[in-house]
Amino acid sequence: MGIRFYKANTPGTRNRSVSDFSEITHSKPEKSLTFNVQRAKGRNNRGVITSRHRGGGHKRLYRLIDFKRNKIGIAAKVATIEYDPNRNARIALLHYQDGEKRYILHPRGLNVGSSIISSLNAPVLTGNALPLKNIPLGGEVHNVELQPGAGGQLARAAGAVAQIVAKEGNLVTLRLPSGEVRLVSNECWATVGQVGNTDAINMVVGKAGRKRWLGKRPHVRGVVMNPCDHPHGGGEGRSPIGRPRPVSPWGKPALGQRTRKGHKYSDQMILRRRK
């Protein structure tokens, strides 16, 4: 894929960039694999905002993605590569030999017409899925399971890739895109290769309206609010926050403070925390 820039004729397009969508081969999704999802817009079942700065945005159809890759031993051919409005990665439509169709995350370098398979002893080729114990050291993978059979949860964003750095006993050591190094069972499955659309990280939004298309609302700074709305609020004119450190609207340390809970069961699996 590539990035397309606009000629600088308006403030909204001066620094804006978009994908050229050169890898997309089909415009309409597979109807049997799409359905409507009622978006929560940051509200819970009582209508109370639980996640701020969400709402609006363009309507979307959800594409059902196969994160489990559990059609063992049945080869599939890549039919199309499509755009998915629900993620920054592209998706690939697979036609299996038994007639079933499924979407997967599009791995970088996988083309229409390529054949892939999920198998215990599948060749270590881009797009194939197999257990971590059968992938050699240094191998690059994505869509990695945390629990065997639970479906891929790690390294699923555009351009994401995890690397196998060690194997010991029934555990495999992975270096994740965040910089975290953690242990995973060698029975967990993963897909070989890197997620496509690697230039997604280099996109420049360019204008506020484009964020609204994505369903993201303005993020108002606490320092410009009233004291009743935020701990940073109040004062005459432009005032400092008046505290030793920045805090959230609920008084919790923010802006750099680590928020992971201590003494979690998974701490023993994390060898090095994320950067």
UniProtKB/Swiss-Prot annotation:
Major localization listed first in the record, in broad terms: plastid
Subcellular location: Plastid, Chloroplast
Region (Disordered): 225-275
SMART domains, A to Z: Ribosomal_L2, Ribosomal_L2_C
GO BP term, pick one: mitochondrial translation
Ribosomal protein as UniProt keyword: yes
InterPro entries named in the record: NA-bd_OB-fold, Rib_uL2_dom2, Ribosomal_uL2, Ribosomal_uL2_bac/org-type, Ribosomal_uL2_C, Ribosomal_uL2_CS, Ribosomal_uL2_dom3, Ribosomal_uL2_RNA-bd_dom
Keyword tags: Chloroplast, Plastid, Ribonucleoprotein, Ribosomal protein
A GO CC annotation given for this chain: mitochondrial large ribosomal subunit
Pfam families: Ribosomal_L2 (PF00181), Ribosomal_L2_C (PF03947)
GO molecular function: rRNA binding; structural constituent of ribosome; transferase activity
Top-level taxon of origin: Eukaryota
Subunit comment: Part of the 50S ribosomal subunit.
Family: Belongs to the universal ribosomal protein uL2 family.
Protein name in the entry: Large ribosomal subunit protein uL2c
Organism ancestry: Eukaryota, Viridiplantae, Chlorophyta, Ulvophyceae, Oltmannsiellopsidales
